Amino acid sequence: MTQQQDELDQIKSQIQEHLISSGNYDIINKQLKLQLYESGWFDKVTQLANRELQENSAHDTAVSFDQLFSFVKPKAEEMVPSNIKEDVLERLKDYLDDVIQ
């Protein structure tokens, strides 16, 4: 790892620690969960996982949690509505602007 990468990792760690200690992490996290719930994202991801389990069950194929997670995770990330992604990014930018100034 390069010195620049080490410094970047250290800054990232400090930001994460400050986000948590200031309570902003909980605020952003709760708002994100609410927005995802209201958008139906949780239901859609549950349906996706259930379909995958049913398909594998129909073929008498056992699926581990890790396999299911590997299948669902990228699709679930793509399913997050763009307005929610933008809102969370805006909240993080606002937080960073306040911390840096």
UniProtKB/Swiss-Prot annotation:
GO BP terms: chromatin organization; mRNA export from nucleus; protein transport; transcription elongation by RNA polymerase II
Lineage: superkingdom: Eukaryota
Keyword field: Activator, Chromatin regulator, Cytoplasm, mRNA transport, Nucleus, Protein transport, Transcription, Transcription regulation, Translocation, Transport
Primary location: nucleus
A cellular component annotation (GO) from this entry: nucleoplasm
Pfam families cross-referenced by the UniProt entry: EnY2
Compartment(s): Nucleus, Nucleoplasm; Cytoplasm, P-body
Family per similarity comment: Belongs to the ENY2 family.
Quaternary structure and interacting proteins, as annotated: Component of the nuclear pore complex (NPC)-associated TREX-2 complex (transcription and export complex 2), composed of at least SUS1, SAC3, THP1, SEM1, and CDC31. TREX-2 contains 2 SUS1 chains. The TREX-2 complex interacts with the nucleoporin NUP1. Component of the 1.8 MDa SAGA transcription coactivator-HAT complex. SAGA is built of 5 distinct domains with specialized functions. Within the SAGA complex, SUS1, SGF11, SGF73 and UBP8 form an additional subcomplex of SAGA called the DUB module (deubiquitination module). Interacts directly with THP1, SAC3, SGF11, and with the RNA polymerase II.
Protein name: Transcription and mRNA export factor SUS1
Gene: SUS1
